[in-house]
Amino acid sequence: MTDRKSTGGALDRRTTLKLGAAGLGAAAFGFPAIVRAQTDAIRIGHLTPMTGFLGALGGYAVLGIKMAEEEINQAGGVMGRPIQVISEDSINPDTAATKAQRMLDRDGAAFLMGEISSASALAISQVAARNKRLFLSIGARSDTLRGKSCNKYMFCVDIPNTVMVNAVGSALLRDNMVKGKRFVTLTADYVFGHDLLRAAKAFFAAHGGNLVGDELVATDVTDFSPYLLKIRQARPDVVCSNLAGNQVTNLIKQYAEFGLPYPIVGFNLNTADAWAAGEGNLSGTWPTVWYHTLDTPGSKAFVEKFVKKNGKPPENHAWIQYISLKLMAEAMNAAKSTDSETLGAYLEKGTQFDILKARKAYFRAWDHQLIQEAYPFTVKPKAQIKDKWDMLQLGAAVPNPDQPLESIYPTREQNPCSL
């Protein structure tokens, strides 16, 4: 396909020669001296946006999963076999579905991983279900994926929208910024944003906040001046962003240029988008699943290796792709299988995985959500910022150490998932 952007895939003559050379080098990593046929590698289909409004996040995703792939192979692979991650640009839901099917049919992928776009993740999950192959949805956050659109073959790693709202909401409640306050929201006009708005409305209603206006924003919008003029007219107490990808970056830059006096917070932010906004532009409280200053031994070691390899700190999508491939390698070794039914049953057992945080994580059997800590963060004063990567101050993990991890996740009563 002419639109294909890939770091693995079709076995043309040049690729075959390269793979043959890689097989010869495998002996140095602990594999038998006899050169293995490429079909003996465990092939994993990996889809993520590498272009478009989520492209910057996808770039970090590829760096993270490739780093994990290298480490796993250097340690002997999985069940004595090398793994090969085939990464491609998902582009949009239709293309993502087509490529997912091709990875299974032509490339011989054992299962599928990846994605950041909730819309594309939904499309891939449908391919996975039809083919009865496991899909590890790594970076998509829509509650819908874990709710009414859940299926037996999809497992979700990233924190869902409800958890992001709860993470930021706990900080807003602490600072008396909800009850009786008037909110205006800007929402990404696709499944993720619509889903996030529902979670935000539920939070406002439960805690006495008043939503006085919302604007749906197309994912290709770059000029936010019409929306900022409406905010100026509405004169809210708080502005809340339900945007995604470079939408957030563009909003933050233009919000600072307009000089609006209303505090801005957000229920979704990825750190690459925060970094791109530039020093002095971002403000308020935002949620994250991980940040490179997290003070745990495992996280610090990962950051050190990533910086040494790439010359910059890892963004949260690099971290989450890295730990996702590591936990799948652990699952395959423990289950002694690459079969999707076997792996799914293993993940449903509640096995705890080290994801480089203070508390270990596990998949919940009834909705396939990885249960883990989340964090709010705020923006450092400009005088305290050391470099462009040092803008954010990570808050305390939620839930508190003495609370169950599931306390910030939707309950069975709140979640319509039926596997």
Predicted regions and their residues:
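Extracytosolic ligand-binding ectodomains
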Residues: 2-7, 11-21, 29-419
